[in-house]
Every structure is written in structure tokens, then in C-alpha cells.
């Protein structure tokens, strides 16, 4: 997991897509959430940033599950596992898309740490949650995020399970339409309205 993006990129700086109104944050181990994040980024032409654990997860599935259980137990005690990703400022973003895998019903631990660390900076932002899972629901993880980021507002969520991943493109497009998120809205300054007057007629053109 982890994708093809340049690992040398400063983790404090989102990878620019359009530097507009939207930011896609994601963590992913098997690649499902990453594919969702990339689809959203490509549709909106927006910035994207991977939230990475300080220590990479084991390639062995059972080893990863054991570590996930340990980290979830630690979080319940208020101890968040270290990550190497941070964002200085969310000031330019209207919607922050937050993507994660669901582990044992909970949000993947790297993203829990990120939101815990950035809760005050996300106050007042709209957060759009999307997640992937084998079969688990999303509701418990939504409750976790609402507790972590109590100052934010939340949109409708998107969950893809192993049985619906093949519908990813259509599901994401429908979801983004529901949110009113589009490439055009991400770059509102790219449209220019020009009034053209000919005699007593005035025509407004969008360029």
C-alpha cells in the first residue's frame, strides 16, 4: 500500500492538484481507500495528502491486525500512535475530504491521530468522510470523528465495502453531486462573466 506518489514530498504540504477549495486527506494500507481518494482528487482537480504512520505497517496481514488492535486499545486510553504527516493551515479549504479504512469498526488509527492533532485547525470546516471496509458499517467511525473534531460540520458520508468497490466511480460521482462539490466549484475564479453591450442589447457571456 502507499501508492505511487513521490515519497520525498514534504508531508506538511499537500500535493497540489488545483490549490482550490477542496483537500483530500487519506490513509490506506491495502490500497482501496487510496483508490477512492485518487478518484475524488482527479474528479475535483484538488489537493491531496496521504496521512502516513511513523512506522509502516507490517506486510503480514495477521501482524497488521495485531498492531491495529493494540493501537485502537491505546487510543481508548488517550495514547495516539505517531504519524509523520501534518498540515500547517487549512485556511483555504472549504471542504476537507477524509478517507480511511475501517478497522474493527473504528477509523484507521493514523487518521484518528491526524484528526486528534489537527482538531482545532479543522474547527469550522466541512468534513466529508469516506471509507472502505470488508463489511463493517461506518457509523461508529463517524461518532469517533464527531468527538475528535467537535468544532467541524459534517456532510453525508460514503462507504464502499468489498461488495461495492466495483461501483466506485459511479458511487463517488453521485456522492460528490450530493455534496455540491465539482471541479468548477473548486476553481470558481476560472470562470469569468463578461457583459457585452451592442446597441440597446446586453449579453452576459461566461468565459
Question: Predicted regions: what is each one?
Answer:
Residues 6-23, 27-54, 67-188:
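FMN-binding flavodoxin-like domain, especially the glycine-rich phosphate-binding loop
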Residues 58-67:
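Hydrolase active-site cap/lid region
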Residues 197-205:
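Short, solvent-exposed loop/edge segments of extracellular or virion-exposed proteins
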Residues 191-193:
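Short loop/turn and low-complexity linker motifs enriched in small/turn-promoting residues
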Amino acid at each position: 500500500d502507499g501508492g505511487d506518489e513521490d515519497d520525498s514530498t514534504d508531508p506538511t504540504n499537500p500535493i497540489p492538484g488545483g490549490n482550490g477549495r477542496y483537500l483530500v486527506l487519506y490513509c490506506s494500507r491495502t490500497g482501496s481507500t487510496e483508490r477512492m481518494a485518487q478518484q475524488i482528487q482527479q474528479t475535483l482537480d484538488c489537493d491531496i495528502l496521504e496521512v502516513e504512520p511513523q512506522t509502516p505497517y507490517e506486510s503480514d496481514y495477521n501482524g497488521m491486525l495485531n498492531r491495529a488492535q493494540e493501537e485502537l486499545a491505546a487510543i481508548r486510553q488517550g495514547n495516539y500512535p505517531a504519524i509523520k504527516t501534518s498540515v500547517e493551515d487549512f485556511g483555504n479549504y472549504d471542504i476537507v475530504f477524509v478517507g480511511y479504512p475501517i478497522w474493527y469498526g473504528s477509523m484507521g488509527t493514523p487518521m484518528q491521530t491526524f484528526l486528534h492533532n489537527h482538531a482545532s485547525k479543522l474547527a469550522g470546516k466541512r468534513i466529508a468522510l469516506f471509507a472502505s471496509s470488508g463489511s463493517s458499517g461506518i457509523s461508529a467511525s463517524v461518532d469517533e470523528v464527531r468527538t475528535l473534531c467537535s468544532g467541524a460540520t459534517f456532510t453525508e458520508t460514503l462507504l464502499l465495502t468489498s461488495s461495492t468497490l466495483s461501483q466506485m466511480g459511479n458511487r463517488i460521482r453521485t456522492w460528490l453531486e450530493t455534496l455540491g462539490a465539482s471541479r468548477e466549484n473548486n476553481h470558481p475564479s476560472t470562470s469569468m462573466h463578461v457583459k457585452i453591450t451592442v446597441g440597446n442589447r446586453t449579453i452576459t457571456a461566461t468565459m
